[in-house]
Amino acid sequence: MAKSIKDHLQDALSNIGADNLRRFQSRLGDRKQEPRVRKSTIEKLKDEIDLVDLLVNTFTSDAVSVTVDILRGIKCNAVAEELLENTGQGGVSQPEPPVPEPIPKDPAQLKELKVTPCSQQFKNKILREKGQETYEIKDKSVRKRLALLINNVDFDDKAMKRSGSEKDEENMEKLLKELDYQVVKRPNLSAKEMDEAIRDFAQREEHKYSDSAFVVIMSHGKRDAIMGVHYHRTNNPSDSFPVDNVYRRLNSENCPALRDKPKVILIQACRGGEHGRVWASDGEPDEPIEIEDDDFVHKEKDFISLMSCTPDTKSYRHVQNGTFYVQTLVDVFIKCAHEDHIEELFRKVLRRFEHPNMIGNFKQMACKDRATLPKLFYLFPGL
């Protein structure tokens, strides 16, 4: 027997999880268009069945389109599209994309959040529709994913200390673990030690049993190099690590275990200028927030990189909460990795940097670099 509209609505709402269901009900109560639903009515609902009855009785033939709009509003896009497909309403026009969100006002929120898990239903749908266009993801029970995390905080030149980057390290490590990567941490390295760390990482046996890898480097930098902890502009300018060496160490020749597997490179550093700044939020004019800048860097198949800023520009860091780049990237991955492939996740990060209130009067734009992924890389968190 064919399913009714109520059945499809109940399937969709049962598939979004308890947290998203609460967000759905909150959005429904906040809806301004007529007919409106009283919040007191929503508070009396016992389960998804009651919610579906309310949707159908209130919106009648528009119940599906209203549900889809709210699902998209809470970023359950995959469930929304599946509902449209299952109800034969795939021609419903999509709303205008929302204004990109700024980074969380309280970056400590990131510590509380977990990556939204991917549903098996969504994964099956992607593999069914785009299987030949996606990278193979190994079964969680047998794979051994690795991520390398290099964070230079303390430099010989005390003035170069990257205050706040400990928070970046904490947030990035949490994200990578949530995505099922074992994190190899190497703090405070010279240029030579960075090269050795990436070389050793490339030789790890676990890559044979992995489907992908992440390399995250956070430091000061220049346009095409990352600074080691012994760097000094006049006394030791040679302690800098060419970004090209990241790609050379991980290419198909030097790291055959990762051949034809996606390798994601994330670099937080500046690409020009070295002076700290002070920025005051419009909302807190009496409490200036100290902002510093990091200097930055850059090359194969199956690589994709997201740099914290474009060439010849600065990358800003809050001296307590960490960089805007890492805060934004982690927030996007937490909320969207369950339904977006890696390039779409990066695009959403870039959209956030367009937001006029991102970091006040300072301008910074993250930069996708050396993207050589011939296929779509879905992380399918939780699966």
UniProtKB/Swiss-Prot annotation:
One BP annotation, GO: positive regulation of inflammatory response
What this protein catalyses is: Strict requirement for an Asp residue at position P1 and has a preferred cleavage sequence of Tyr-Val-Ala-Asp-|-
Q: Which domain of life is it from?
A: Eukaryota
A Pfam family assignment = Peptidase_C14
PROSITE patterns according to UniProt? CASPASE_CYS, CASPASE_HIS, CASPASE_P10, CASPASE_P20, DAPIN
Q: Where does it live in the cell?
A: Inflammasome; Cytoplasm
Q: Which residues form a coiled coil?
A: none
Question: Which GO-annotated molecular functions does the record name?
Answer: cysteine-type endopeptidase activity; endopeptidase activity; Pyrin domain binding
Repeat in keyword set = no
Enumerate the SUPFAM superfamilies for this protein: Caspase-like (SSF52129), DEATH domain (SSF47986)
Query: What is the documented function of this protein?
Result: Thiol protease which cleaves IL-1 beta (il1b), releasing the mature cytokine which is involved in a variety of inflammatory processes, and mediates apoptosis. Component of the NLRP1 inflammasome, which plays a crucial role in innate immunity and inflammation. In response to pathogens and other damage-associated signals, recruited to the NLRP1 inflammasome in its precursor form. Its subsequent activation causes the cleavage of pro-il1b into the midformed il1b, which then evetually leads to il1b maturation and secretion in the extracellular milieu.
Subunit architecture: Heterotetramer that consists of two anti-parallel arranged heterodimers, each one formed by a 20 kDa (p20) and a 10 kDa (p10) subunit. Interacts (via pyrin domain) with pycard (via pyrin domain). Interacts with caspb. Component of NLRP1 inflammasomes. Inflammasomes are supramolecular complexes that assemble in the cytosol in response to pathogens and other damage-associated signals and play critical roles in innate immunity and inflammation.
What is the protein name given in its UniProt record?
Caspase a
